[in-house]
Amino acid sequence: MPPLDFEPLNEISILERSKPGTLFCFGHGFSSRALARRLIPKGWEVSGTCRDIGSKNILNNEGLLYKYDGININKEIYNAIDKSTHLLISIPPQVSGDPVLDLLSNENLNWNHLKWIGYISSTGVYGDAKGEWVHEDSVLKPATAINQRRVAIESAWLKLYKVKNLPIVIFRCVGIYGPGRNILISVKLGRSKRIEKPGLVFSRIHVDDLAQTLEASMLNPIPGEIYNVSDDLPSSPSEVVEYACGLLGITPPPLVPYYSAELSGIARGFYEANKRVSNKKIKVDLGVFLEYPDYKVGLNALLKE
């Protein structure tokens, strides 16, 4: 429930109307910060939540941060959402569900001022496709608990769109990489593994291409839609490690057969899902032109940064 002293803001100043938009991000992390870096120079106001920011809100070139423990939504956050035109949710599914979904489902609050509500999900909802291509209308076969929760939350969001006519858009993302989070860093630190599993391929997306996809949807929202977000070249994980090692002039780690590799339960589940993720819809419907169409282009760009 909202704080007792929460009062929705009814008046919008001339200054607010002159902005392209105001974005609030639940989970202002790797992906939403990349989006903020695109939007803020264009005049957008961006803010979001973070678990630990100290005692004060932080304002930087990636937006204003509000402390949020994942459970209690305070008055500051309510007011920030009330002033926003766009809302992005990138918080991973909780065992208890999605706290933001619970908030927007509240019958006592009116969120009709929101022009776009984006929810970042995962292509993990498709499960294992035996190396075949998956599209937005492919059968969902989540194999892990977290992806089963994602399917349930996606369904609840889409129900909210149908019942309350809120502008929900779902983005199913593959593995996201970019500055500060990529295989080049793992190779340099000696943490990369070269696991051999014949026929296995993964899809990836550079965080800046995810950001441009989100922006394209924000500017031309189609409520109720689902988009896969992926690059053009599904590739084997060992191939990517080898390429990264070549760029750095480092000898690749030894090739280890998957069935004898020492992997955590989460990592092993990751290697069990074999699929190629189609990105045709974001290109056709949103006009997205990938800046980093495959991992080779992406890693070469990161090497120069």
PLM-predicted stretches and their roles:
Residues 77-119:
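NAD(P)-cofactor binding segment of oxidoreductase domains
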Residues 13, 213-214, 220-267:
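Mid/C-terminal beta-alpha module of Rossmann-like enzyme folds, strongest
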Residues 73, 242, 261-289:
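Conserved C-terminal active-site "lid" loop/helix of NAD(P)H-dependent oxidoreductases
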Residues 1, 293-305:
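Amphipathic terminal alpha-helices
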Residues 141-169:
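Active-site Tyr-X1-5-Lys
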Residues 103-145:
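Conserved Rossmann-fold NAD(P)-dependent oxidoreductase catalytic core, especially the SDR/UDP-sugar
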Residues 151, 164-166, 176-189, 195, ...:
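Glycine/proline-rich active-site loop of Rossmann-fold NAD(P)-dependent oxidoreductases
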